[in-house]
Amino acid sequence: MYMAMTSSKPLNVVRSFYSVAQNFVDRPLVICDIDHTLFRCSKPLHHYTEFLQKLYSERYRFPVNVEEEALNLMHRAYCDGFIQQTDPAGFRHMVERIEELGGRIVFLTARNIYSHARTLEDFRKVGFEHPETFDIHYTNNVITKGDYIKCMQLDSGFDHVYFIDDQHGYLESVQRECPHIHCFQFQYKY
């Protein structure tokens, strides 16, 4: 874990849910992002880059921004369901710690509420049983996560709240609107 600076206070950058769980105290509430935090594309970016470089070098002779195309291809694959968990063992450990300490986990995503069925299917795809029992909140990408937590009072009844996301902007919004929440920027490694 290392610290990155935001406009207000240091931000904890982690590569595993183990690092987050080390900070838990009595009755933690964990608010966890889904896309690119809990789930990631099943193939790394270099897979798509190498594929496109080979394809373009063998079949096409025109200039193309391979890195941009690879990123688009990876995003399409992710949206089509080629996903896996970023850190299965670390996430299991974190959930066990939450349960040991009498806490709770909720998921907060920028996805649209109309994608709820797909979200549940994505959870099943990566190995979660009974995702219909999960507490999943959707911002519909129309409100920041900090504003959502504050407006919906997601942190109500908990003294120790932890927020995990991969997007710096969402983390800053939580720090701004809910300064008592401990924020962790998740950066998975292939």
Q: What positions do the PLM features span?
A:
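Non-catalytic pre-domain segments flanking phosphatase-related domains
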Residues: 1-32, 41-53
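A short, conserved beta-to-alpha structural element at the edge of catalytic cores
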Residues: 56-69, 181-190
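Short, acidic loop-to-helix structural element flanking the phosphoryl-transfer center
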Residues: 58, 64-106, 113-120, 143-148
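A short, structured active-site edge motif that brings together acidic residues
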Residues: 110, 120, 125-145
